[in-house]
Amino acid sequence: MPKETFFRLPLEKRYLIEDVAIQEFAENSLQSASVNAIVNNAGIAKGSFYQYFENMEDLYKHVLKLIKDRKMELISTLPLPANNLDTFRYLQRLLQIDLAFELKHPLLAKVERRHNFENPVTSSIDPETGQRLSGDGRFHAFLSQGVFHDDIATWVDTDLAAYVLGVVSRWLSPYLLERMEQDSGKPVEVNLDISLDPHLQDLLQNLMDLLMAGMARDPQIRKDFYSK
């Protein structure tokens, strides 16, 4: 993480360095990103860079933390549902958060996609059991709760499903934005209230129908889907 000297900088200068770094990492991997490009675009001396950060990886980790922080900020802005969420409604809310992040912070979203592409999460370790799991560990807990609450069928391979949901969560947002622009013929507004946009909600609902048809415990849900 950055050195204390970085956090003592005036906010305007600190934000400038962060913005320049985000632009650099949006277009380049950690290995190919240039310290020279960052210091030149930020208007700082190269020696100052190393007063603020240990190395380029230190700055990169700081940008990844910014991504997490911005997502946490977005969670508080989306309206809470009136009732408790079932497994699939909870997943829909998570996807809305990802989409809001893509819309409001496109460069940070691009950094995150590049990071995920270059560092694919093919497995994770369960902190309680030590068991190696496929994909993002967050979805294993999510799916286990779904099975426990009878939202998800017991025959579902949660290891495989967790991996698939991880892939969906990382790459769905840019597709949805592009799809909305194609369908409407105009750019999506940055301040769009995604929770109220009917076209977007229709697309998300269709995705939920697909997932429910494959994983829901209630066989009637699958029957209804395939009869459409």
Predicted regions and their residues:
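Amphipathic alpha-helical packing segments from all-alpha helical-bundle domains
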Residues: 69-72, 89, 121-151, 159-163, ...
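Generic hydrophobic, amphipathic alpha-helix propensity
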Residues: 13-21, 38, 63-71, 139
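Amphipathic alpha-helical linker/stalk segments
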Residues: 63-93, 110-113, 145
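C-terminal peripheral helix-coil segments that are non-catalytic and often amphipathic
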Residues: 141-149, 167, 171-228
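Helix-turn-helix
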Residues: 16, 27-58, 62
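Hydrophobic alpha-helical connector segments
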Residues: 77-105, 158, 162-165, 201
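N-terminal intrinsically disordered/low-complexity leader segments
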Residues: 1-12, 219-228
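Amphipathic alpha-helical segments used for helix-helix packing
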Residues: 90, 101-123, 177-187
